[in-house]
Regions:
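Flexible, D/E/H-enriched segments
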Residues: 1-92, 96-100, 120-195
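Beta-strand elements within well-structured catalytic alpha/beta cores of enzymes
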Residues: 71, 105-113
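A structural signal for small-residue-enriched, beta-sheet-centric alpha/beta enzyme cores
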Residues: 116-118
Length: 195
């Protein structure tokens, strides 16, 4: 799409520019690599893009003038959530698609979403973060699906990014398990860059 609506913007509507040319290139690359993908040029008006994208728009791209291509991984809705191995491989192909695009444009790849939540699982968070830092593809591809439950499933976004950035080094900026209750509920927050 030429632009994406952020329906969760607190004041009025917000539209972000898209990049149809690169999007079509990525889609065709995925099809050529036998990666099943769904495509939409319009989101439901009263829903727009989800909060994971809205956070990036407001915090990372506040001017709203950089074209974006939202790639949504089904982290939450069973029964067809991708395995972490599939996520890693899709990330690799995303990077291959971008690298094969004949353009001088600079492209950044970002991911958002939890580490563990709504019940914090520091162990699985730390395993995933350590594997991303050490470029441990085997560990990333074999994270136990039975531990990727509730919001913790969003670790799939991190694994997808790890596949895309496998030739770069991750710099963990911070990891904070933010507990809300003594029962262990809350949200673990992680922030990292790759270079």
């Amino acid at each position: 799409a030429r632009e994406w609506r952020n329906a969760q913007e607190p004041v009025g509507d917000s539209f972000q520019p898209g990049h149809p040319e690169l999007a079509k290139h990525i889609i065709q690359h995925f099809v050529n690599q036998n990666i099943d993908i769904s495509v939409t040029n319009k989101l439901q008006d009263d829903i727009g893009a989800g909060h994971a994208f809205a956070f990036l728009y407001r915090q990372i791209l506040p001017e709203g003038n950089i074209p974006i291509i939202p790639l949504m991984v089904n982290c939450f809705y069973p029964p067809n959530q991708p395995t972490v191995a599939r996520c890693y491989d899709v990330g690799k192909e995303l990077r291959a698609a971008i690298d094969s695009w004949e353009s001088d444009a600079r492209v950044a790849i970002m991911a958002s979403g939890g580490l563990s939540h709504f019940i914090i699982d520091e162990e699985i968070d730390r395993i995933a973060l350590a594997a991303l830092e050490s470029k441990d593809e085997e560990t990333l591809k074999t994270l136990p699906n039975d531990r990727l439950i509730l919001g913790t499933t969003e670790i799939r976004n991190w694994v997808t990014l790890g596949g895309a950035m496998e030739d770069m080094t991750m710099n963990l900026i911070d990891y904070q398990p933010c507990y809300r209750t003594l029962a262990g509920t809350g949200c673990a927050m992680g922030f990292a860059t790759w270079s």
